[in-house]
Amino acid sequence: MSEQPKKPTKKKVELDPRFVDVRHVWVCIESERGVVHPVSWELLGEGRKSVDALGGELYGVVICGPGERGKEICGEPVQHGADKAYLLQHEILRDYRNEPYTKALTDLVTATQPEILMLGATTLGRDLAGSVATTLGTGLVADCTELVIDTETRNLASTRPTFDGSLLCKPSSAQRHRPQMATVRPRMAMPEPDASRSGEIIEVPFSMIETDIITKVLEFIPDDTRDKPNLPFADIIVAGGRGLRNQENFQLVWDLAKVLGAEVGASRPIVQAGWAELDRQVGQSGKTVRPKLYIAAGISGAIQHRVGMDGADVIIAINTDPNAPIFDFAHYGIVGNAITVLPALTEAFKARLGQLKKAG
């Protein structure tokens, strides 16, 4: 008989004595000209869980320029679960540039030593997190979909995609140094704001001169995203998979989405076939979504797709295979050909919504 494989043991790493009593969790509040990215509030929900496990305090860190609602923004992390908020405000911090933002954040970390520092896995967050981790000489787990604290070791464990999204790995931070850092994908559960909560706002002085910075801001051009997919924050998504067979049939997804006022999503094979752009891909190597309604047409429900959408409030699956994995976690299932079911749904919704419009 072959021997049973031994269970992996937890790797114990002796903490640097400087960090033994460190317990606080920080969330970097991402904002642009006074507008906060929603991922910041989602991270505060994750941060609150970590703090409750560690027994420390949760801080929001706001970095911005003068006149960008700095103090007002600092009140919002408290309403979303933070105990306190740091405010770093300076003219040089008005528009994001890596050098001043890295200096602002690393100087603050060095002075106060948090246990964990979280940033959104956004364009800004990914750029800033790497340079901060390198400057501090600490570890960084990027593009996480889930975070968990090991209360025994105080290590931060995470779930993230690997091998181009075909597998999930669960790296754990076993290091002597702090903070433990992670960038987290948007569209995790967002805590409900509580206007009755209050907390301290700590203004932190920051000093840097323009000549110290290599990059220069020449002009600010707002990003017009009206015609771009915004899957992570859509309330309704209609997504199609290879069960639709060809690009012409994928148009049926667009037809239903138009009637419902929904965003269009796609599985990875659809994007690879060129039927939909990459920004519409849902799943481990695409977008993580949490809509109120997710309609999956011709999608089998493989793990790579599931991890990107199983947080939806309601999932309706359409598939010809009654044993398709998607039926294991869908709230409602239609065993049938999506090519015939989608037009029927489109007409039914169109008629019902028309009736409601006339009545109301």
Swiss-Prot record:
Gene Ontology molecular-function annotations: electron transfer activity; flavin adenine dinucleotide binding
UniProt GO BP: fatty acid beta-oxidation using acyl-CoA dehydrogenase; nitrogen fixation
Pfam families: ETF, ETF_alpha
SUPFAM superfamilies cross-referenced by the UniProt entry: Adenine nucleotide alpha hydrolases-like, DHS-like NAD/FAD-binding domain
PROSITE patterns per UniProt: ETF_ALPHA
Keywords for the protein's UniProt record, in alphabetical order: Electron transport, FAD, Flavoprotein, Nitrogen fixation, Transport
Residues at which FAD binds: 293-321
Protein task: May play a role in a redox process involved in nitrogen fixation.
Family designation: Belongs to the ETF alpha-subunit/FixB family.
Subunit organization: FixA and FixB form a heterodimer.
Name this polypeptide is given: Protein FixB
